[in-house]
Amino acid sequence: MSAISSLVPSRFLTLTAHLVIVITIFWSRENNVLACLPINFTPQQFSSRDTELIIALSVTLGLFAVEYAGFLSGVSMFNKTQSLLSVGAHASATVSLLFFLFEGWDCSLYWWIMSFCSALPAVTEIIIFIAVFGWKRKPL
């Protein structure tokens, strides 16, 4: 299998691995919320940070929907540039979020991980959607 033809399964696997880790963080977000708070915190501070993390994770799930829609519909499945960007971003996100989950990183770091590793590929996916459906160009 050549390097180009292996981008499609690699993209699917890294996208799915990133999705699984985001869902895992959703289920066990209490430890990460506690890592964001000072030692003496109020229930209101906990609730505020928990809501912030829920919003960030929900935005990430929305960005996954955009990427899966473009990928599974075939619009960007064979686009080499998008596949390479997506594989790199989601592999980086997978590793970063594993550290975020197990090391108890601060919640504000999640926004950085989301913006570079989820929002960037989703924005390029939207650009490909516009090029294909709006300007009637080939997806390759």
Swiss-Prot record:
<keyword id="KW-0970">Cilium biogenesis/degradation</keyword>
<keyword id="KW-0325">Glycoprotein</keyword>
<feature type="glycosylation site" description="N-linked (GlcNAc...) asparagine">
    <location>
        <position position="79"/>
    </location>
</feature>
<keyword id="KW-0217">Developmental protein</keyword>
<keyword id="KW-1133">Transmembrane helix</keyword>
<feature type="transmembrane region" description="Helical">
    <location>
        <begin position="53"/>
        <end position="73"/>
    </location>
</feature>
<dbReference type="InterPro" id="IPR029248">
    <property type="entry name" value="TMEM107"/>
</dbReference>
<dbReference type="GO" id="GO:1904491">
    <property type="term" value="P:protein localization to ciliary transition zone"/>
</dbReference>
<dbReference type="Pfam" id="PF14995">
    <property type="entry name" value="TMEM107"/>
</dbReference>
<keyword id="KW-0812">Transmembrane</keyword>
<dbReference type="GO" id="GO:1905515">
    <property type="term" value="P:non-motile cilium assembly"/>
</dbReference>
<protein>
    <recommendedName>
        <fullName>Transmembrane protein 107</fullName>
    </recommendedName>
</protein>
<comment type="function">
    <text>May play a role in cilia formation and embryonic patterning.</text>
</comment>
<feature type="transmembrane region" description="Helical">
    <location>
        <begin position="84"/>
        <end position="104"/>
    </location>
</feature>
<dbReference type="GO" id="GO:0036038">
    <property type="term" value="C:MKS complex"/>
</dbReference>
<keyword id="KW-0472">Membrane</keyword>
<feature type="transmembrane region" description="Helical">
    <location>
        <begin position="7"/>
        <end position="27"/>
    </location>
</feature>
<dbReference type="GO" id="GO:0016020">
    <property type="term" value="C:membrane"/>
</dbReference>
<feature type="transmembrane region" description="Helical">
    <location>
        <begin position="113"/>
        <end position="133"/>
    </location>
</feature>
